[in-house]
């Protein structure tokens, strides 16, 4: 299976999540978490930090990432590794290819016409919120 990652970034108040607006397929024009491919010979953790930095400018000094869960998509032969982190300080975002936007956590995450992932995004965010509330 091809290894991919998603990085879910919360602001310090934990009331907003960072999204990119996809510039290409799949999900072109929709909000999605940042992330990308795990390169050959690269650790999963290093790949998550690399993708986060490349796409947002957020580095290891700004956030501590934790591997949260994996989703396997057998039809596409993808192993999607979900990482989560809360910013430790204010950061200035640096956009790579996709526009970046902070989105308030509310029921708007359920809009399938706005968010990628066929309703996976609100499920992932809710599971992470429960996890963080119980002490990450």
Role assignments for model-derived ranges:
Residues 1-18, 34-37:
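Conserved N-terminal beta-strand and adjoining loop/helix that marks the start
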Residues 3, 69-106, 118, 123-135:
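Active-site-adjacent beta-strand/loop module that shapes the phosphate/pyrophosphate-binding cleft
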Residues 15-16, 54, 89:
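Glycine-centered loop/turn positions within well-structured domains
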Residues 26-29:
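A conserved beta-turn-beta hairpin within the catalytic core of GNAT-like acetyltransferases
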Residues 33-67:
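The catalytic Nudix box helix
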Residues 108-112:
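A generic structural signal for short hydrophobic patches within well-formed alpha-helices
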């Amino acid at each position: 299976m091809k290894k991919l990652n998603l990085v879910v970034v919360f602001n310090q108040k934990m009331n907003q999540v960072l999204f990119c607006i996809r510039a290409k397929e799949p999900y072109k024009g929709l909000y999605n978490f940042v992330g990308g491919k795990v390169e050959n010979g690269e650790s999963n953790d290093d790949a998550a930090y690399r993708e986060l930095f490349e796409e947002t400018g957020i580095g290891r000094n700004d956030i501590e990432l934790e591997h949260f869960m994996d989703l396997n998509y057998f039809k596409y032969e993808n192993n999607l590794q979900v990482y989560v982190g809360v910013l430790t300080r204010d950061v200035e975002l640096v956009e790579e290819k996709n526009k970046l936007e902070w989105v308030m956590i509310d029921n708007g995450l359920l809009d399938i016409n706005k968010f990628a992932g066929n309703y996976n995004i609100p499920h992932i965010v809710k599971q992470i919120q429960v996890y963080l509330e119980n002490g990450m």
